[in-house]
C-alpha cells in the first residue's frame, strides 16, 4: 500500500502499545527495556522521525535491534518487524501543495494578463428586473471568470484531500500495525514456498545418487561361465576382420557411391562446387573459410550425409572443438544435413565462420585499444557488427569503421541467390565513403592491418585534398615552388606531403596514425609562433592548408629579414607607428614586414608581403605629421602619427631572378629596391603635378626579372610647364626650344660619399653636340654630351625617396640658358674655353689674352619648396630666380667694371644684355688698359692723384682732387661710329680750377687734335682704340700744371687768367660703381645718343651720378 502519512504531533512517537516488544534472534524484549537502552539518544530528542531513526540508512525497511538484548527472553510472542519504508512528514506534503498552489496562481495571473478584454462590453438596452448591472459580459471577460472559477475549484479539492489525510494520519499507528501484519504474512508465505522448492530440488538431485543393489548371482555366472544362461541368443555372427585390401575396396565403393550421388542426385550449393572425394569421404573446400568432410552411412541414395571433420582455412582460427562441444557441433550439423541438405549445412557453417571472424577481429581490436592504440580507439560489438572508431581524441566530426555481415538477399535482376559476406562501412569525418580500397585479407585476419589501411586511405584523402588546394596557389601552380605528395593505401606513416617553402626551406606534412594530429616539420626549423591558432571546428584539410600557408609565409618573411639586414635595412614595428598597413595590401596576404634605410627619405619605406599567391616587395609612401627637420624614420618615438598615402607593388617575388642568392645578388637587390623607391617617388611627384606628362604610370613601374630598375620618360616643354617652374630665359631660347621634348630619367646607383641616389636624365638637343663635347668642363661631372650625336646626360643627386623633378626642371632650363649664351658668344666671335651648367669661361681681346667667365645662378624660393606638388603647381609666384654674373681675373683690366657689366647682363631680355656686354668688352678694353697705365703706382706710397667714378660701363667721371677738376668720359655715337667724348663736368658757378689749367686744357685738348682724338671747343672726341692717347694728354696737362706751380717764377698767362683755374691734382685710385643707372639702356644705340654739345644729356648724366654708390679700389 502507499506510504503512511503522519501528523506532526506523532513525529518521533513510537507506534507500539505499552506492551509491545522487539524480537531479536527469536527473543523478545519489552518496550521499556528498549527505551532504557536508547536512553542516551532519547535525551537529545525524538529517536524516530516518521518511524525512521535519525542515523539509520534510508534503504533499511526494518528497524535494527541492539545486540545486547539477545540474552533476554520474554514469554510473549515475538515482535513483528516494523516497516518504515515510504513514510514521509505530512508537513512536507502541505508545504509542497501550498507552493504548487502559489505557482499555479502566478501562471494564472500571467495567462489572464495576456487575454485581451474589450473594455466596452455589450450592455442590454434595458436594466434587469433585479436592478443590478450585469457588468462586462464580453467573451474575453467571461473566459477570465471561468478560468478563475476552475482554478478555485481545483485547489479546493486538493486542500479537501489534505484535510482528509490530516484526519486519517492521526490514526496512522493502527494502519502501521496492519502493514506490519501484512508483511509478516507475506514473509511466512514466501518461506513456505521456498521450503517446497527446496524439497523438490533435493528429491530430483537424489535420483542421480541412487545406486542399484549388486546382482552377485549374475556376476558370478559371468565370471565363471563367460555367459548368462537367462539371456537369449539372437544368432548374430561377428563380422570377419577386414583386411587391408578389403578396407581399400570398401573405401573405393563408398567413394563411388558418394561421387555418383553428388553428380546425379544431390543439389550442391555453389560454394561447394569445389570438392574432392577420397578415403570414403567428400571434402568440400570454401576458400578463406573452411574444409568440411562428410560421408554416408548407407548405400541408400536418400540417406543423409554425416559429419566427419571440419578445418578452418583462415588464421588466426579457433582450435578444433573436442569433447562435448564437438559432439554438439556434430549433432547440429547432422540435423541440418538431414533436414536441409548440403545447402543448409553450408549456410550454417558459413554464418558460423563469418561470426567467428568478426569475434576474432573484435578481440584483436580490443587488444589494440588496450596496448599500442590506447586512447586512440573505441571498440564496440553490436550483435554481429564490429564498430571501431579511430582518432577518438580528435575534435570535430568523428570517423569509424563498421565490419558486419551483409545479408545475401537475392537481387531482382539476378538468378543466383546472394551469399552473406563480411562487408565494411566506412564513415570518414562524419560522411559515408566507399570502402573498396580497404586492404582486407579474408584468410589472414588482422585488425591492425585493416585499421592501418583505413587510416592510410583517410590520410591520403586528407593530404591529397590539401595538395589540390595548395596547388591552386600561384606559387605552386606556376612551378615557382615545388609540391609533391607521397600516398599509399596500406601504411599511413608513409603518407606525406613535401612543400617547398622558399629556395632553401622545405616543409614535410604528415598525420600521426594513432591520434590523427597533423605534424608539420620544416627544414631548417621555422618559428612556430604563428602556428598556434587552431580552430577545432575546421576540417583537417583546411587546418593543414591554413597552417602550411602560415608557416610558408612566416618562413619567407624570416628568410628575407635575415638576408636584407646585412644590407642596412632596418625593420619597423607598425604597432609603434599605429599604421593600419593591412588596408592597403590585398586581402590574401598573410605576413608582412616593413623596412627603412638610412639612405632613404623619411616619407618612404618598403614592405615585404607574403601569401600563397606570391611574395612581393612594395614601396609605401607616408605623410609624416611632423616638420621635415626631424630624426630619421626608424626612430618613431618623437613622431606624430604618419599617414599612409599610397602603396605600390614593385616585384612579384622576393628574389625576381632565379639565380644563386649570394652576397652579390643581395647587394643588387638592395640597389634595385633603392632605385625603384627613387623612381616611384619621382613618378608620384609627376602624378601629383598633373601638368607634366610621363610614362609609364606609377602602378606599372616594377623591378625587371634581371633586377633592372625601370626608367621614366618625361615630356619636357617649357611652354606647358606651370608658371611657378619657369625661368626667365634668353629671348632666343623662348622662341625656339633647344632640347627635344622627351627626357628619360634613370637610376644609376647610390653615391657612397654623398649617401644619395644617383639619378641621370638623358635627353637630346635639337642641334649636334659635336662642338660642345670638347668645351665641357672636366671638373663638372653633372653634365656630359654624346660624341658625334645630339644626346646629353645630367647627373642629379638626392636621397632615395626625395623627388628630383624640381632639380631636373631647373637644370634643363639652366642648360637651355647656357646653350643660348654659347650661341650668342659664338655669334660674337668670342672664343669659348669651357662651360658647365653654372659657368661659361671664354677669352677675348685682339690677342686673345684676356679671360672671363659668366656665372649662371638660379635661386629657389624655399618657402614654396615646402608645399605639396598640387599646391605648388597652382601658385603664381616664381620658384626660380635667374641671375647672371661675370667674373674677371686679377690682371684683367675689366675687373674695374665687373659689377656694371653684371648689371647689364641681368636686364631683360637676357640675350640683349649679353650682346651688350660683349660689345662693351670690345668698347671699353682700350679705355680700361689706359686707366691701368695711369694707375700704375709701383711704390703704392704716392698721393691720390686721380679719382675715377664709374657710372656705368659707358659713363665715367674723372676727378683730380688736388686740382678740383672734374671731367666726364662718355661713349657716344659720332658720325655713325662709336667714340669716346671727354667734357668738362665742373659747374660754371662752382669751378675752382686754376686759370692756367683751364687755358692749358683749352690750348692742349679742346682746340687741338692728336693721335686718334680731336678737340671740339667744349670737349674732346677720341676713337675707341685711341682713347688712351687722349687720357695721356689730359694727364700731361695736369702734370705740367703741377710743375709750374712748383716753380716760384711761374706766372699765369692772360689766357689762363680769363678762364677758370685748376688745382694740381694727384692721380687717384679708380672708384667703381656697383650696379647701373636708369639712364643706361641695354641697347647700345640708345645709350650712345648725343654729342658733348648736348647739355641735356650732361644734365641727365649728373642726375644719374647722384643716385649711384661709389666703391674705392687701389
Swiss-Prot record:
Q: Could you tell me one molecular function GO term of this UniProt entry?
A: transcription coregulator activity
Q: Where is this region: Disordered?
A: 1-27, 40-79, 120-141
InterPro entries assigned: Med14_N, Mediator_Med14
Name the PANTHER family for this protein: MEDIATOR COMPLEX SUBUNIT, MEDIATOR OF RNA POLYMERASE II TRANSCRIPTION SUBUNIT 14
- Cellular component GO terms held in the UniProt record: core mediator complex; mediator complex
What are the UniProt keywords, alphabetically?
A: Activator, Nucleus, Transcription, Transcription regulation
Compartment(s) of residence: Nucleus
- Tell me which domain of life the UniProt entry assigns to the organism this sequence originates from: Eukaryota
Q: What does this protein do?
A: Component of the Mediator complex, a coactivator involved in the regulated transcription of nearly all RNA polymerase II-dependent genes. Mediator functions as a bridge to convey information from gene-specific regulatory proteins to the basal RNA polymerase II transcription machinery. Mediator is recruited to promoters by direct interactions with regulatory proteins and serves as a scaffold for the assembly of a functional preinitiation complex with RNA polymerase II and the general transcription factors.
Polar residues: compositionally biased ranges:
126-140
Q: What is this protein called?
A: Mediator of RNA polymerase II transcription subunit 14
Q: Could you describe the subunit structure of this protein?
A: Component of the Mediator complex.
Record family assignment: Belongs to the Mediator complex subunit 14 family.
Q: Predominant location of this chain? A: nucleus
What biological process terms from GO does the record include?
Answer: regulation of transcription by RNA polymerase II
Amino acid at each position: 500500500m502507499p506510504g503512511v502519512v503522519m501528523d506532526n504531533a506523532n513525529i518521533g512517537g513510537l507506534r507500539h502499545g505499552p506492551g509491545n516488544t522487539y524480537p531479536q534472534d527469536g527473543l523478545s524484549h519489552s518496550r521499556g527495556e528498549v527505551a532504557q537502552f536508547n536512553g542516551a539518544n532519547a535525551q537529545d530528542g525524538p529517536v524516530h522521525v516518521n518511524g525512521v531513526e535519525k542515523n539509520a540508512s534510508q534503504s533499511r525497511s526494518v528497524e535494527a535491534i541492539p545486540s545486547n538484548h539477545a540474552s533476554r527472553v520474554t514469554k510473549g510472542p515475538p515482535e513483528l518487524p516494523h516497516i518504515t519504508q515510504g513514510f514521509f512528514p505530512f508537513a512536507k506534503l502541505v508545504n509542497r501543495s501550498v507552493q504548487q498552489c502559489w505557482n499555479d496562481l502566478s501562471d494564472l495571473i500571467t495567462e489572464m494578463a495576456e487575454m485581451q478584454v474589450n473594455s466596452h462590453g455589450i450592455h442590454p438596452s434595458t436594466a434587469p428586473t433585479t436592478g443590478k448591472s450585469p457588468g462586462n459580459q464580453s467573451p474575453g471577460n467571461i473566459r477570465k471568470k471561468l478560468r478563475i472559477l476552475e482554478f478555485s475549484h481545483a485547489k479546493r479539492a486538493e486542500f479537501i484531500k489534505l484535510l482528509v489525510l490530516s484526519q486519517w494520519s492521526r490514526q496512522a499507528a493502527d494502519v502501521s500495525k496492519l502493514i506490519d501484519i501484512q508483511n509478516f504474512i507475506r514473509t511466512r508465505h514466501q518461506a513456505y514456498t521456498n521450503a517446497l522448492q527446496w524439497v523438490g530440488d533435493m528429491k530430483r538431485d537424489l535420483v542421480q545418487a541412487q545406486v542399484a543393489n549388486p546382482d552377485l548371482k549374475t556376476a558370478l555366472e559371468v565370471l565363471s561361465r563367460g555367459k548368462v544362461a537367462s539371456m537369449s541368443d539372437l544368432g548374430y555372427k561377428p563380422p570377419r576382420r577386414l583386411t587391408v585390401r578389403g578396407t581399400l575396396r570398401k573405401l573405393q565403393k563408398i567413394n563411388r557411391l558418394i561421387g555418383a550421388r553428388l553428380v546425379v542426385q544431390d543439389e550442391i550449393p555453389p560454394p561447394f562446387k569445389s570438392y574432392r572425394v577420397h578415403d570414403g569421404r567428400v571434402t568440400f573446400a570454401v576458400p578463406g573459410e573452411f574444409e568440411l568432410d562428410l560421408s554416408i552411412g548407407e548405400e541408400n541414395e536418400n540417406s543423409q550425409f554425416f559429419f566427419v571433420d571440419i578445418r578452418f582455412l583462415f588464421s588466426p582460427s579457433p582450435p578444433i572443438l573436442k569433447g562435448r562441444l564437438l559432439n554438439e557441433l556434430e549433432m547440429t550439423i547432422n540435423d541440418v544435413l538431414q533436414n536441409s541438405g548440403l545447402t543448409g549445412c553450408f549456410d550454417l557453417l558459413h554464418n558460423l565462420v563469418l561470426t567467428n571472424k568478426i569475434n576474432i577481429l573484435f578481440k584483436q581490436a580490443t587488444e589494440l585499444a588496450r596496448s599500442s592504440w590506447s586512447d586512440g580507439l573505441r571498440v564496440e560489438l553490436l550483435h554481429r557488427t564490429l564498430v571501431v572508431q579511430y582518432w577518438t581524441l580528435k575534435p570535430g566530426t568523428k570517423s569509424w569503421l563498421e565490419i558486419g555481415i551483409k545479408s545475401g538477399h537475392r537481387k531482382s535482376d539476378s538468378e543466383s541467390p546472394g551469399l552473406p559476406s563480411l562487408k565494411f562501412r566506412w564513415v570518414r569525418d562524419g560522411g559515408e565513403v566507399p570502402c573498396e580500397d580497404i586492404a582486407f585479407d579474408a584468410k589472414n585476419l588482422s585488425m591492425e592491418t585493416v585499421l592501418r589501411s583505413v587510416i592510410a586511405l583517410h590520410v591520403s584523402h586528407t593530404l591529397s585534398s590539401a595538395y589540390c588546394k595548395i596547388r591552386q596557389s600561384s606559387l605552386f601552380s606556376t612551378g615557382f615552388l615545388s609540391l609533391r605528395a607521397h600516398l599509399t593505401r596500406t601504411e599511413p606513416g608513409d603518407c606525406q606531403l613535401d612543400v617547398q617553402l622558399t629556395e632553401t626551406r622545405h616543409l614535410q606534412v604528415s598525420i600521426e596514425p594513432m591520434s590523427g594530429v597533423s605534424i608539420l616539420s620544416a627544414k631548417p626549423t621555422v618559428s612556430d609562433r604563428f602556428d598556434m591558432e587552431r580552430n577545432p571546428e575546421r576540417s583537417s584539410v583546411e587546418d593543414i592548408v591554413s597552417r602550411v600557408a602560415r608557416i610558408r609565409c612566416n618562413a619567407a618573411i624570416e628568410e628575407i629579414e635575415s638576408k636584407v639586414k646585412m644590407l642596412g635595412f632596418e625593420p619597423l614595428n607598425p604597432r609603434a607607428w599605429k599604421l593600419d598597413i593591412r588596408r592597403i595590401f590585398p586581402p590574401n596576404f598573410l605576413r608582412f614586414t616593413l623596412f627603412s634605410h638610412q639612405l632613404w627619405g623619411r616619407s618612404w619605406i618598403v614592405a615585404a608581403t607574403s601569401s600563397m599567391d606570391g611574395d612581393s616587395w612594395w614601396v609605401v609612401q607616408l605623410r609624416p605629421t611632423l616638420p621635415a627637420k626631424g630624426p630619421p624614420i626608424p626612430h618613431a618615438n618623437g613622431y606624430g602619427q604618419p599617414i599612409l598615402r599610397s602603396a605600390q607593388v614593385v616585384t612579384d617575388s622576393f628574389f625576381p631572378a632565379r639565380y644563386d642568392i649570394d652576397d652579390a645578388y643581395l647587394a643588387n637587390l638592395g640597389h634595385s629596391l633603392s632605385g625603384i623607391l627613387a623612381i616611384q617617388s619621382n613618378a608620384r611627384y609627376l602624378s601629383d603635378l598633373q601638368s607634366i606628362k610621363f610614362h609609364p604610370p606609377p602602378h606599372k613601374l616594377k623591378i625587371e626579372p634581371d633586377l633592372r630598375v625601370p626608367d621614366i620618360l618625361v615630356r619636357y616643354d617649357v611652354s606647358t610647364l606651370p608658371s611657378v617652374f619657369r625661368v626667365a630665359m634668353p629671348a632666343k631660347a623662348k622662341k625656339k626650344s633647344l632640347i627635344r621634348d622627351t627626357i628619360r630619367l634613370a637610376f644609376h646607383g647610390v653615391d657612397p660619399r654623398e649617401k644619395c641616389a644617383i639619378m641621370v636624365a638623358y635627353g637630346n638637343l635639337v642641334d649636334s653636340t659635336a662642338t660642345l663635347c670638347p668645351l665641357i668642363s672636366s671638373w663638372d661631372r653633372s653634365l656630359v654630351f654624346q660624341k658625334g650625336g645630339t644626346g646629353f646626360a645630367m647627373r642629379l643627386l638626392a636621397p632615395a625617396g626625395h623627388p628630383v623633378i624640381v632639380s631636373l626642371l631647373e637644370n634643363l632650363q639652366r642648360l637651355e640658358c647656357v646653350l643660348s649664351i654659347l650661341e650668342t658668344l659664338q655669334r660674337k666671335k668670342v672664343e669659348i674655353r669651357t662651360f658647365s651648367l653654372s659657368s661659361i669661361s671664354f677669352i677675348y681681346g685682339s690677342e686673345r689674352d684676356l679671360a672671363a667667365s659668366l656665372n649662371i645662378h638660379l635661386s629657389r624660393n624655399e618657402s614654396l619648396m615646402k608645399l605639396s606638388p598640387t599646391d605648388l603647381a597652382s601658385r603664381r609666384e616664381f620658384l626660380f630666380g635667374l641671375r647672371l654674373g661675370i667674373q674677371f681675373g686679377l690682371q684683367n683690366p675689366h675687373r674695374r667694371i665687373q659689377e656694371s657689366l653684371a648689371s647689364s647682363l641681368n636686364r631683360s631680355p637676357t640675350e640683349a644684355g649679353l650682346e651688350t656686354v660683349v660689345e662693351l668688352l670690345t668698347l671699353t678694353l682700350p679705355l680700361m688698359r689706359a686707366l691701368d697705365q695711369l694707375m700704375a703706382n709701383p711704390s703704392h706710397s704716392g698721393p691720390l692723384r686721380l679719382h675715377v667714378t664709374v657710372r656705368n660701363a659707358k659713363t665715367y667721371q674723372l676727378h683730380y682732387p688736388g686740382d678740383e677738376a672734374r671731367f666726364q668720359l662718355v661713349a657716344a655715337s659720332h658720325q655713325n661710329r662709336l667714340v669716346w667724348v671727354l667734357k668738362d663736368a665742373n659747374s660754371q658757378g662752382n669751378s675752382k680750377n686754376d686759370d692756367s689749367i683751364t687755358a692749358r686744357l683749352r690750348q692742349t685738348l679742346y682746340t687741338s687734335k692728336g693721335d686718334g682724338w680731336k678737340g671740339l671747343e667744349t670737349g674732346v672726341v677720341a676713337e675707341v682704340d685711341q682713347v688712351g692717347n687722349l687720357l695721356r694728354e689730359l694727364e700731361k696737362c695736369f702734370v705740367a700744371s703741377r710743375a709750374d706751380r712748383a716753380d716760384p717764377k711761374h706766372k699765369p698767362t692772360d689766357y689762363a687768367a680769363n678762364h677758370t683755374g685748376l688745382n694740381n691734382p694727384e692721380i687717384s685710385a679708380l672708384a667703381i660703381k656697383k650696379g647701373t643707372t636708369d639712364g643706361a639702356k641695354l641697347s647700345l644705340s640708345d645709350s650712345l645718343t648725343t654729342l658733348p654739345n648736348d647739355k641735356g644729356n650732361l644734365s641727365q648724366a649728373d642726375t644719374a651720378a647722384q643716385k649711384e654708390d661709389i666703391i674705392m679700389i687701389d
